[in-house]
Amino acid sequence: MILDIDMLRSFYASYSESVAQAKATVKRPLTYAEKVLFAHLFDPSQLRPYKRGVEYVDFRPNRVAMQDATAQMALLQFMNAGKDKVAVPASVHCDHLIRADVGVEKDLPEACKTNKEVYDFLKSVSQKYHIGFWGPGAGIIHQVVLENYAFPGGMMVGTDSHTPNAGGLGMVAVGVGGADAVDVLTGQPWELKMPRLIGVHLTGKLSGWATPKDVILEILGILTVKGGTNAILEYFGDGLDSISTTGKATICNMGAELGATCSIFPFDGNADDYLRKTGRAEIASLAQQNAAELRADDEVLANPSAFYDQIVEIDLSKVEPHLNGPFTPDAATPISHMKAKGPANDYPMVVEVGLVGSCTNSSYQDLARAASVARQAYEKGIQVKGQLIINPGSEQIRYTAERDGILDDFKKIGALIMTNACGPCIGQWKRHTDDNTRKNAIVTSFNRNFRRRADGNPNTYAFIGSPELTVALTIAGRLDFNPATDTLLDKDGNSVKVDVPTGFTFPPKGFAVEDKGFIAPSEENANVEVVIAPDSNRLQKLAPFAAWDGKDLIDMPLLIKTEGKCTTDHISMAGPWLKFRGHLQNISDNLLMGAVNAFNGESNKVKNQLDGKYVEVSTAAKAYKAQNISSIVVAEDNYGEGSSREHAAMEPRFLNVKVILAKSFARIHETNLKKQGMLALTFCNKDDYNKVQEDDRISLTGLKEFAPGSHLNITLKHKDGSEDSFEVEHTYNDTQIAWFKAGSALNFAARK
């Protein structure tokens, strides 16, 4: 059985009472996010008015979801915990390792062959420890979770940064690293800094070409990629009624690009419909019984500024179709401005490829509305200028869309139908292009557009829009085509407009599927053997990291001083490296290969201080490690922005990097660094970043007095013999300091 019905019945039986107790304790009305948070305290007796953005709180999530690229490391860690089964319902989803090339018919069998060792490991470890397993082709983790597992008022963690997608159905769903997931899987408290609350007030109604995707693209322009850090975005207002559950999921999904802990919508009639249409009528009824507590209290809605830390006002009737990019998702541009902005910024204006799919926009409604645009091109005889690629979100969606003729609408204009998987969105794309050195533009319905992310090509300018706009721009072949005002030529040379997209929220005949691709958890797991070949280059058992030796870190060579944006894609590249996600030694060869060296402006070229030669980052790190020398990385703002991949923390730890000193950190990555026993430190004065020189030997002192709220000391020994000193700060609490001293959070847990 897919649904964990007993857990859900038990949860709803006590949910409203838990919320009532929280209100009585804090003595005020609650926002919806607060209700869910307070209802999931690991120890309810510790309930109090926690200070947002400051205090760490222990929670007890209802479930865990893992995708195949991050599940490997998470489950390798779980295997060392000595448990017979997972403590909460959990699932593994095989969606990240499938490469998009020529179409699903060839790509899926090739992926099953190429990744057989990893799939066999994940399947067997799932059977061994009572975890639901969704095989390759079953679908993208967050779409599958929304269709099968998400429920209003619940809390889940997932080893993927876009886990907040489930907030569209009213969950507090948080992306985490594997070590955090292991905490939940083993029944330990899961620690999270009490989030700030950003209220997003939606009024009016979307119209024309504007979609839910454009709502979050506009918000990204307002708040930026750092604006949601350590915050939950809670949506409220009369504008909610006009947005479907899958549309709300899209908005919550891209809250990750704001750096938000998660985003959440209240339970409403649209959520009730979605639950019933996806075969969860009992859950809908249970939610209805608790409906009063699956939303913010009336007092909150009447005076939101008294309860939220920040308010963002969005009038949906004024939202325009957006095209965000290139290279960062917060570069927000209404499509009506692109005619001026494109040439002014020297963007390549020809759209070569349009890509529809990803966990952000691959629902039935997304495909139906995008297909209505494709259908018009075919029926009106409009020549399609670019290549169109489609990735359905799940096998249920693919099967239903095929039955309803939606996929045929795409195929009629030459679209390639790829596997129900992430594909190009996370760099799993064998792009066929005639010249990799040419500046070129692609348009996607994805969530991220970092340089090199989709196709590995630094000359690709990637822009993010809705599925409908993506198809329209691909048909037009122009980045500045505004479907609301511009025309195209039909086969007879007549100017024709593309009408406003249409499409059903739910399939009129209902969802259908022959085989979802799911293997239920086994009750007979004692004899299941999890085999990892000793000579495997894909999987490697983990050895514990060494504990702190009790000494300060003296004369560390600077491994790299990064300049500008340094995301987890820069730190631990995906694409061709995904195959090594279960092998720490091998994947560490990609350490910081995408980061820009502040001293030469180049990527993956740093000075090895032992011989003065310029080498790859991992080569320098390995040289230092071979001499038992610790090293340090210095970075700018929002270091570690992007995905939840803990490899970006484990790789430097494995290669003996002890400190990451940055102007600021992205939330998930900072936690991942702490979990792996590293020191994630920030400049007290950001200008001190400029004092760091290429040949510096750097000392960190004060570690014996390392305590919450304390400062540590940095001394830079420059090549000319001069020195600079300054203080650095941190956000470690007592438990996290214990992780550092033990060598990692897992080491600390094993010693308790």
Locations of the language-model features?
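Short glycine/threonine-rich loop-to-helix capping motif typified by GTGT followed
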Residues: 47, 147, 151, 243-249, ...
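Long, structured ligand/cofactor-binding scaffold of large enzymes
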Residues: 8-11, 15, 20-195, 581-633, ...
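Acidic, glycine-rich flexible loop/linker segments
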Residues: 488-505, 670-739, 746-749
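Non-catalytic terminal/interface segments that mediate subunit docking, oligomerization
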Residues: 76-80, 306-401, 405, 524-659
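Extended C-terminal subregions enriched in glycine
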Residues: 379-429, 435, 643, 649, ...
